[in-house]
Amino acid sequence: MANKNYRFETLQLHVGQEQADPATDSRAVPIYQTTSYVFHSFDHAEARFGLADPGNIYGRLTNSTQGVFEDRIAALEGGTAGLAVASGAAAVEYAVRNITQSGDHIVAAKNVYGGTFNLLRHTLPRDGITTTFVSAENPQEFEDAIQENTKLVYFETFGNPNADLPDFEAITAIAHKHHLPVIVDNTFATPYLFRPLEHGADVVVESATKFIGGHGTTLGGVIVEGGNFNWAEVPGKFPTLTEPDPSYHGLNFYEALGGSAFVTRIRAILLRDTGATLSPFSAFLLLQGTETLSLRVERHVENALKVIDYLKTVPEVESISHPSIEGRKDNELYKKYFPNGGGSIFTFDIKGGKDAARVFIDNLHLFSLLANVADAKSLVIHPASTTHSQETLEELEDQGIHQGTIRLSIGTENIEDILDDLKGGFAALRESGLAK
């Protein structure tokens, strides 16, 4: 695929297996269901374990089905290297831990997925890694929060759950001025709608469970490296990448591997030691989803914008959180960064608070009440009592999550059926008299 600049829709079908499988002539990517691999000789085995010869060593680290998936997502994101792991949460933690240690500091947007918020707020501090949370709407807050021991800046393409947008280029410029890498979670946008590496990000993480898999069947995560960040620019700033690693006989990952050092170290060290490995079958299922990613995302976005137009007409709706709405702070950013639209996962606030939300949700029949998002099926949830329930009321309010906040993940069903289901929920709410 390197000899021609194929477009996204072609890349999502072909990268990683441009020709039939050499062992079987299978056109589909085979499921290499194995734990280990035969080395050709004593020297071959030694070279593999020493990272002198890239290739399969053991199933915890690499697998050929997984390798195709990694290459494909890296190509779609425009990166130099990719690593697939067992979940999106594992991808986030590995990416962060790869360049942090006790005594280090992170600057992160406060409007992130609840699991990521808990990782940064509660789990990492136990290991001596602290985070300052700032508003993604205000790039200056990122700069004001940077300390001498800050190691990275972290935010999401679309905030979770309110679909609010950061100013990517402004924030990444600030981070790079201070010699800091930017890690962006691109789960809610996907590389089809937005490629963070083209707007200043250095590392992209995604929950492949969501749009990439697309059908609510498979957990997975992916980390993609941009390959342009100079980890050695500030001596001693990123010792895990620029200083000798004793577990690899003094290997300096950045010197040896350059633009793939970040991802390779995660595979060689973190995945080796903690083993959040993606199974070959999961990699196969995620590849099936990847092949139709653009088609599904177009339909998700088309349906979502029609749902938003409908919600604007409903008197029981207090507010809608979506960057496509004129007058919002991030509407100009939406027009700039998302010319083809985006944001099929968003929230609205319903009059009547939690009790009204309960009636509305319990009277939906097409929408499934569950914690996942970006399924082909339409989904609904009440964040304050579920996905973000471990946060304090103050933290929830600070993130724009209220007792009347409802998150929708708009699927690919017929739009009239989606709207009919929502109308049924609002009809039940009116009958209850709770929407006051």
Spell out what each predicted region is:
Residues S41-E93, G115-T123:
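Conserved N-terminal alpha-helix of the aminotransferase class I/II PLP-enzyme fold
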